[in-house]
């Protein structure tokens, strides 16, 4: 078993921000490792542009080894199979065991797949991004009609990015499109989707797949052979057996200090964590990075921790697939190429800020 003073499990947005800060200033004392499934971290905000061909794969990812080297952190490649929260031991899929005096979890979430009967329909999830790209390359060789599940920002952006690449596209969401965002943003998104020929079905939750049919309740609502999942985040199965306290949906319950409610020596951020007033979004994970960095440093040095104050509102920018973007802020919305340039600048800046030479 390999032991560390601190293990950063997962190369999510918050952990990238922590590593960047430690590369620029002094990091906490002790042996620190970053555990990641692969040598790169993908920036999900650029996925629609990547799928639509506006970005190359190299534009959308951060090489982890240079960043870890600059932060004086060991890069450990491996996938988590189990976690014992009481002992803070991570069991990896290849049999290795890692133990941390402190742990920080930024491991994202999986995607909920509707129960499927038969194998007539191919199902592809929007994450992990590497598998999405592999599957999408195969689908591109023979374009067919397709459905997308997910009426959030990710589903809308993917629908607009793919509208010109498939013969017919349908977008299904269980509630209202872009629920919780500015009403004007929803109307603008609906207009763009309809203009691009996307069939939008609101308040149409998909409960199961039977052969090549999508069913809402007992009603068949769409027939085809390709389904892209862009909604329905679910915790990784190993979290349920970890002894960590969780919310009703199974996500890790955390305190304002970003510590797990049940285990103070384990921090959790991003999509895997649940805090009152915090929505699961990459934008919020980025904003957790400064507090997480400060609190990990304080924890290793025995100092008091800071509280993270979750934001109820944030700027929403949705790529429209043609170089433009839709913007939403509180009850105000706008759209156009100017906002697309602004979104591109923000996305490219994020990737550039976390790239280190060498």
Residue ranges and their predicted role:
Residues 9-11, 105, 149-150:
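Conserved N-terminal Rossmann-fold NAD(P)-binding element of oxidoreductases
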Residues 134-168, 172:
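Rossmann-like NAD(P)H-binding beta-loop-alpha module
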Residues 19, 284-311, 317:
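Internal hydrophobic alpha-helix adjacent to the cofactor/substrate pocket in enzyme cavities
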Residues 2-3, 70-145, 228-230:
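FAD-binding core/adjacent interface of flavoenzyme oxidoreductases
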Residues 75-82, 98, 166-256:
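A Rossmann-like FAD-binding core segment of flavoenzymes
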